[in-house]
């Protein structure tokens, strides 16, 4: 959202425009040469862009949809702006990775949803859109990259539909379409917490000093869900100077 990605497109000679509600970042991006509207992306803003600049051949939205409660509102905005032959590419946290890797700590207040292909495909179909390709990324533990176009006029990407079906089958095989899978996962997570607490307490009793490595937001999720306190961790280190010399939320480590 600081214009880094769009700069590459601009360097290739394309017209670019950013949209981000963080006014300080939008201002910085604009000053660096990437015009960025300090707005929330929605249908109204999308229609204004289409009116003033024309429809977009490419719309990118990387790791921002999870921060927005109204996913269908995003889709309405994309429909108002996307050219009939255009492609919308977005990245979101992939539930298959979150589940298979046990990344429950990435589920916190800023991440209101995680996605799988099967329900996304049905959602887009109801809006006259379709997924034409998918990919996976290791960013933030595992991300899903979707390529979406209009149902009737989307470009064809070689191997795209095969990739879509492959992930749909993988999701079903992992049991992600079954609620019982997540009840079992919850029990497994809680058991892991009990084992971790026992391990830390045992180390402390033997005279060990235990330090936390890294202070991301997900660390707070982990500490609260596993009830880790000052008695368990002496302190936490992080190379981000903005976090140094402070304490963790609530636990005050």
Task: Give, region by region, the residue ranges found by the protein language model.
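A solvent-exposed beta-alpha-beta segment
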Residues: 30-32, 201-253
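A conserved beta-strand element that flanks and buttresses the S-adenosyl-L-methionine
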Residues: 57-60
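Conserved S-adenosyl-L-methionine
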Residues: 129-140
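A short glycine-rich, Lys/Arg-flanked "PGG" loop and its adjoining helix->strand segment in the class I
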Residues: 72-89
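Short amphipathic alpha-helix with an adjacent loop that forms part of the alpha/beta core around
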Residues: 44-54
């Amino acid at each position: 959202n600081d214009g880094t990605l769009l700069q590459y497109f601009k360097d290739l000679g394309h017209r670019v425009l950013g949209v981000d509600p963080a006014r300080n970042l939008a201002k910085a991006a604009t000053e660096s040469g990437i015009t960025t509207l300090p707005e929330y992306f929605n249908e109204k803003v999308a229609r204004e862009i289409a009116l003033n600049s024309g429809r977009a051949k490419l719309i990118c939205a990387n790791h921002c949809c999870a921060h927005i409660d109204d996913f269908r509102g995003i889709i309405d905005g994309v429909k108002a702006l996307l050219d009939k032959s255009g492609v919308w590419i977005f990245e979101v946290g992939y539930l298959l990775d979150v589940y298979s890797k046990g990344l429950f700590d990435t589920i916190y207040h800023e991440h209101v949803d995680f996605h799988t292909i099967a329900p996304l495909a049905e959602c887009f179909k109801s809006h006259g859109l379709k997924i034409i390709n998918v990919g996976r990324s290791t960013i933030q533990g595992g991300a899903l990259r979707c390529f979406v176009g209009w149902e009737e006029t989307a470009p064809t990407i070689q191997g795209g539909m095969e990739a879509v079906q492959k992930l749909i089958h993988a999701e079903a095989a992992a049991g992600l379409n079954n609620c019982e899978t997540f009840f079992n996962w919850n029990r497994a997570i809680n058991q892991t917490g009990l084992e971790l607490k026992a391990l830390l307490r045992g180390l402390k009793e033997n005279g060990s000093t235990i330090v936390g490595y890294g202070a991301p937001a997900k660390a707070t999720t982990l500490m609260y869900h596993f009830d880790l306190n000052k008695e368990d961790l002496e302190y936490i280190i992080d190379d981000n100077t903005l976090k140094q010399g402070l304490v963790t939320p609530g636990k005050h480590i």
